[in-house]
């Protein structure tokens, strides 16, 4: 999603090959957990639902879930030793993933699990919802999103869970 990177098949292959090589190199040098302490915290969350499309899909029976003026979901944080995982209940932007990683205080691997606990569509920065913005495809992306407050609610919830 960076704006200054070519959006081509060749670029996607380059990034994929680089990531694959990195993963294989890391397998040759496994990390040992410093301890085996298990931490699991979760919180039920109510997201304001501003997208009428979700309600219409529910009313038409396309989605087997009740949507009202809000939608209930869940966010979780797990740590095993010095490895930590945080869940995002939808498809998140790099901004939220990087922000979540910044909240994690562990010294080991930091993993963000998207589409975990739920599938609430795109989780976007509030600026995507601003009228007249010039963000490419923002009209489509926001039509597949619960609403502009979702990203901040996830971040605040994770801030409370990651202590």
Features from the language model and the residues they span:
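Non-catalytic substrate/cofactor recognition surfaces at enzyme active-site rims
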Residues: 1-163
